[in-house]
Amino acid sequence: MSIKPKQRKSIRQRLRHFSKVLGPGLITGASDDDPSGIVTYSQAGATLGLATLWTALLTFPLMAAIQEMCARIGLVTSHGLAGTIRQHYSKPLLYLMLLFSFPAIVMNIGADIAGIGAVGNLLVPSLPPIYFSVIFTILLLVLMIYLPYRKIANGLKYLCVVLLVYIIVPFLYKQDIGAIFQHTFIPTIRLDKDFLSILVAILGTTISPYLFFWQATMEAEEVQHRKKKLVVDRKIIFEMREDIDIGMFFSNLVFYFIILTTGTVLYNSHIHQIDTVEQAAQALRPMAGDAAYLLFALGVIGTGLLAIPVLSGSLSYIVSETFGWSGGLDKKFHEARAFYLIMALSLVLGLSLNYIGISPIKALVYAAILYGLTAPVLIGIVMHISNNKKVMGQHTNGWVSNALGFLALIVMAAAGIGLIWMAVF
């Protein structure tokens, strides 16, 4: 059956609209499935089987709601979160936000660098992992200084397509459909340290605080780069929400299938504790055979190279906006020296964590747990800003946004308090 010219035009228009709408939200969603996320979800599947599948249905609306608030703040104020707080709130709140964000982001950078080093060693065993970590750190720093981030992201996001392999693998394996439906729609909760650690790590690596800053700043820069002053209306808000929802859906879809894949392949193979990247890569063996290591390595390297600039960039934006310095990944080095020096410092600090003796796998999970413990404070700040009419004008939260925001705050705070309680008592 041939397609009529009018139909072709309609399809082209829809595709153009689709590509136009996809922006910061899609990059945010893709970078959320970073090495820390991949390993955390893999650990959840290996340790608990399918018991945490239901968390994807919980985190998608919560993650989308928080990221939408951050994006709306950036659109309306033309500033990132730190810049908005600096203009409208007290400095102690700004410093509190920096205090909660800095260690978690640096640890995440270090864990991702270690993860990239480990998979590099997986491909070339003759070279120690630290060699790859150093090489990738230098490569990233050079790329971020000399190339606009959007060019880097547009190239690297194709490597992240490898993650879609996780969606295929479960269909090559004999599945208990009843168990999948049960664990997807009926929450399983156990009040023990191991379960709560995994739950906090899943929440922390999915609803990651660094993405709050990134989303707001990227939307603000989109506004600043326009030749004409942007009038934020319903159409602009609707397109922004489309972008956010698509990006967050992709992120949570991949996370769901990573748990399903590892909860089937690794858990049923009695691999319940992932200590090495080789073990994590085993989940792809049913589809890829001996190429499983290559696919896993490409996925981790691609997501790591996509996410680390987002992490270090987020930290640089926070510090630059806190102290009123000029900054931005669209600027050249001589235009924003302090901004790029902070990025370099964060990479060096992250790399130095490789020398303290924590295994890359554990570091990736620890980073996710730390995010889970610090996120409630930052969600509270985002909620306050997005409900402040002096800041947001007529674009404050509706009741749905507030309901989802408060639910995210309560769920993450409860999981974090439960984990601390178990650890202490």
Predicted regions and their residues:
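Flexible loop linkers connecting adjacent transmembrane helices
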Residues: 2-5, 40-43, 68-93, 118-120, ...
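Membrane-interface loop-to-helix entry segments
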Residues: 135, 144-174, 370, 375, ...
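Hydrophobic alpha-helical segments and their helix-loop junctions in multi-pass secondary transporters
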Residues: 161-188, 204-219, 381-390, 415-425
